[in-house]
Amino acid sequence: MQDRTLTAEVTPGDEITVAGWVHEIRDLGGIAFLILRDRSGKIQIKFEKDEMNDEIVQTGLDVPRESVISITGVADDEPRAPTDVEIVPTAIEVLSSADTELPLDPSGKVNADLSTRLDNRTLDLRKKEVKAVFQIRSEVLRAARDAFRELGCTEINTPKIVATGTEGGTELFPITYFGEEAFMNQSPQLFKQLMIGSGLERVFEIGPIFRAEEHNTPRHLNEATSIDFESAFINHAEAMDACEYVVTAAYQGVAENCITELETLGLRDGFSVPDESFPRISYQEAIERINATGELDEQLVWGDDLPTDGERALGADVGSHYFITDWPSEIKPFYIKDHDDDKTLSTGFDMMHPQMELVSGGQREHRYEHLVSGFEQQGLDPEQFDYYTKMFRYGMPPHAGWGLGGERLVMTMLGLENIREAVLFPRDRQRLSP
């Protein structure tokens, strides 16, 4: 429809054609109003029954809500209309008629549970609050991409079907690949590192990851979006600097470019961009501060992973984004480098929101012999990862990086109760369709 005008661009006095969904119809007797909705907003269509063609009136008032229609008419000033403008139609066409009974109410007047919403995601997205979440998500990814480019990164796309898992273990989805066993990739980690050895030096990727985790919680998914960064010739502290930069840029992009969406969600007044200097807390300090809160039934000891309740207790204590550094080597992956002066401490770090972990990263082990030793210490066969390890014999620079959960970033940024609200079509233990 080349002659179509968006509702937000309608100017009084013009004869225009608008098209969209029937949001609401109000019949007041001699006069009736239809509210038309498109991606830019809404506009009022006025039907004066005694002064208009009967066919136009009947078509406009009999069409079911959420049908798709096209209307041609003259736009007039009308201060009482929702947008101060209304259209008096001279022609109307029903492009697609909707069922009279819908599985949920896109106007939002009748609430639906999350399962019903996800079963009917297309209808759900017609609600302005839901659409706002995904417009903000789009801005988060755009801002992250721009930030990576400002850091001198090259965008890459790594395989999602692999012969071996990044970290081994059971959190893998097996598939049959032309008669051979293969897996859906749980992380682009190993391929990112290969790109460091290629000479690209600094790369990023925004793409899907797959984890066959049994978790069924409001913050876990089995298919998620990972925002990944890897750079040569930096250490773990400089990788944390880059993490702060990208996360802050995402918030800044939303603050500058999503004012309407934040207003729709009731978040504009309270939305703030974090300072680009997150506190850095050692693992030892973290467990001491968690224990001091008294929130856990049992005290944490060195070598324990941090439970969800512990993360929340520490987050409430810190009150902002922060890093946990200097984790025990024994609980970090084989590719994370240890500190040179203390082999019991890794250079691994996690970046936390007060509610949950967002980022995992660290300096990588770039020395071939140490890398192979790390495989063996974690019970992995280095021969199965030969495509990866052999490149470390050909000249691999020191490097560091991280991976950021895209959905978790949006979830925590907007205060969503369930991570599935930040995904168009979530994949979890119960949901494979739509």
From Swiss-Prot:
Mg(2+) 2 binds at E357, S360. PROSITE patterns: AA_TRNA_LIGASE_II. GO terms for molecular function: aspartate-tRNA ligase activity; aspartate-tRNA(Asn) ligase activity; ATP binding; magnesium ion binding; RNA binding. The record marks P82 as: Important for tRNA non-discrimination. It catalyses: tRNA(Asx) + L-aspartate + ATP = L-aspartyl-tRNA(Asx) + AMP + diphosphate. Mg(2+) 3 binds at E357. ATP binds at R211, A212, E213, R219, H220, L221, E357, G405, G406, E407, R408. This is Aspartate--tRNA(Asp/Asn) ligase. It comes from Haloquadratum walsbyi (strain DSM 16790 / HBSQ001).
